[in-house]
Structures are given as C-alpha cells and as structure tokens.
Amino acid sequence: MTGSVPIVDLEAWRAADEENRASLAEIIDGALHTVGTFLLAGHGVPAELTARMRTAGRSFFDLPWEKKEPHAVQRPHDNGWRGLVKHRTDTIEGTGGAPDLHEAFHMGPTHRTGDDAFDALYYPANKWPAELPELRETALAYTAHMTRVAGAVMEMLAGVLGLEPAFFTSRCEHATWTQSVNWYPSLDTVGQTAEGQMRVGPHTDFGTITLLDRQQGVSGLEVWSEEDGWFAPPFVEGTLLVNLGDLMHQWTDGRWRSLRHRVLAPSASAPQEELVSLVYFFDADPEAELVPLAAPVGGGAGMPTVNVGETILKKNIQMLTDLKGHGLFQGELSLSRPGSADSPGSSPADDHPSRPGRHPAQGPQ
C-alpha cells in the first residue's frame, strides 16, 4: 500500500484464498471509489519487451516531419501520428487553449468483420512506417500482452464486485482499444511554455480501463482525489498503473471513479528531461450496450445505458471539433473513411453501422 494508491499483485489475487481475496477486494474497491487507480504487479509483461516497445516507439518521433506526416490521424476513428497539438482520448477540461506538449503514435487491434464500413469505424487500419519495421513487429507482441492483461484485470474487477469472472469480459470479446506511445519532449526541445500549459491537461479517459507504463520524471503524472487534490502517484519499477475510464464509471453507476489526471509541463529544473509513456486504452465491444449495475453493487447514480461504439465515436468527434476550432486539427470530422494500403477503395459509413451477431476475426495488418 502506498498512500491512497495501492499496489495489487495479479498473481497474488489469483492464488488468494477466500479470506485474503476479500481483503484484497476491499482495498481495490476503496481505491477505485476514492481515486480511480491502482498499481498492478505480477502482470507478466516481459521487461525486455517493454523496453523494446519504448525504444521502437521513441524512434518514430525522431523521423523528419515529412516522414511522419503521411501517418497523421485524419479522422475521428483513425490510428497514426498526432503531433505537438492539443489532442486526447479522454474527457476534456481545457487549459486556456494552450496546446499539450507531446506527440503520440496510436495503433489498434487487427480484428476484421468483413464489413468494410464497420471495420473502418471500429477497427481502422494501422499506419506502420516503412522506415521502422521493428515498430510493427514489437507493437504486435507488446499489445498481445496488454490485451491479455486487460482481460485479466477486467476479470479481477468483476471478482472485486462479487460478480461472475466473465461479467465484464463477456462484453469485451472483440473490444476496441488503442495503444499509444506518448513522447513528452524536453523543455530544451519545446522552448518556453505558456501559462497553464502542460504535457497533458487535466482529463479522464474515455474507455473502461487504461494500462499505463510510465517513466519516472521531475514533471510527470499527477492524479486527483477529493481528499488529497493533485498528487503524484507512487512510481514502482515494473508495475503498470491501472486507471478507470468513463465507461467503467458509467458501468458501475458511479460506484467507481473515472481517474482525473494530468501530466505536468517540463520543468526548468530539468530542462533536458524527456519521457516516453506506453498507454493502452481498453474499451469494450463496439456493439455492447452497457447497462449500469443495479444497487447495491452499482453506485445508484441513475446513469443511462450507453452503446460503447457510439459513445467513443461521439467523444472523439467532440475532441477533434474542439481542436479544429483552434486550428490544431486539419483532417475530416466525417465518419466515412477512404481506403488505406490495408483496405483499398472507399468505405462510406452511416453514423453507427451495426453488425448484430457478427464476430470479427483476427487477421494480419
């Protein structure tokens, strides 16, 4: 236990007897009710693979602008590169219009349903740079581990609430997710910062859970709680920070908190410090209808049922509309998408193409 952010060992949870599991469940439930986060040990992601993923991702940002630009995000439902602009996969609070001081490279699952319009919205093609073949190879291995861990965490969270282990994962069999490599440049790189400007402004994430592998820094992550205000969560080498997102807050009908967090601007006391975070945003099946849990398991907030895909797309459009208004996004806000190298041709889509009963298959990308 480190303050209000506990360390939870996944293997210890799995091996615990009824009494010890009840004790662990109380700790996890308390942390998610008050803050919305905990540290995860025993997750089984190889440290060597994590290091390679960080190195491969960081290499992308060293490419010249003209090499990165073809991989830029162009639509709300897109993967690829986002430059030094204010962009998010979260609920935005705003920081006076100053752009966030980071770049990001996003990638997603390789699921395919066979319906081009549906896939373009929910399983868009990845944009792998030809100059960095190791990025694709490493990312596929790393995200396979992160998807495994996300499923294990969702099973554990069901256990914390006294639900069947598959309660959450049964709605996540073909979940949408985004793996982001976030590069936070040094102060020497970005120059003087504007008042109130941050690497990432205060926000909550859109999805169910986020798995964060971060680096320790002078100007790093801060989380918020009503009791403590803003504070830096403990850094423990080899652990992942598990953050709850808006969908899980909704699903538990307010019992658990969607973590409010931010990343501070680079500090004048460490002008050469740059950080790279590996952020895995996990949602649920895009066609899933999330019905808030009834009391006493749910929090009794009276939240409505939501559709996962519609909710995520709506928030992405809201985010990019805000950016476009500030001249920080040059792409399209339409939900139609032309084909890519992976999927030639054009794939127009309606607002929410539905594929009831369809199960996407894993395929190469």
Swiss-Prot record:
Disruption phenotype: Cells lacking this gene are still able to produce the aminoglycoside antibiotic validamycin A, but not validamycin B. It catalyses: validamycin A + 2-oxoglutarate + O2 = validamycin B + succinate + CO2 + H(+); validoxylamine A + 2-oxoglutarate + O2 = validoxylamine B + succinate + CO2 + H(+). It comes from the Bacteria. The keyword Iron applies. Its cofactor is Fe(2+). Involved in the biosynthesis of validamycin B, a component of the antifungal and antibiotic validamycin complex used as a crop protectant. To a lesser extent, also able to convert validoxylamine A to its hydroxylated derivative. One of its GO terms (molecular function) is iron ion binding. Optimum pH is 7.2. Residues 336-348 have a biased composition (Low complexity). GO terms for biological process: antibiotic biosynthetic process. The gene is vldW. Binds 1 Fe(2+) ion per subunit. Residues 331-365 are annotated as: Disordered. Coiled coil: none annotated. Fe cation binds at H203, D205, H261. Pathway: Antibiotic biosynthesis. Residues 174-284 form the Fe2OG dioxygenase domain. InterPro entries: DIOX_N (IPR026992), IPNS-like_FE2OG_OXY (IPR044861), IPNS-like_sf (IPR027443), Iron_ascorbate_oxido_reductase (IPR050231), Oxoglu/Fe-dep_dioxygenase_dom (IPR005123). Its EC number is 1.14.11.52. Belongs to the iron/ascorbate-dependent oxidoreductase family. This is Validamycin A dioxygenase. Pfam families: 2OG-FeII_Oxy, DIOX_N. It is an enzyme of class 1 (oxidoreductase). Keywords: Antibiotic biosynthesis, Dioxygenase, Iron, Metal-binding, Oxidoreductase.
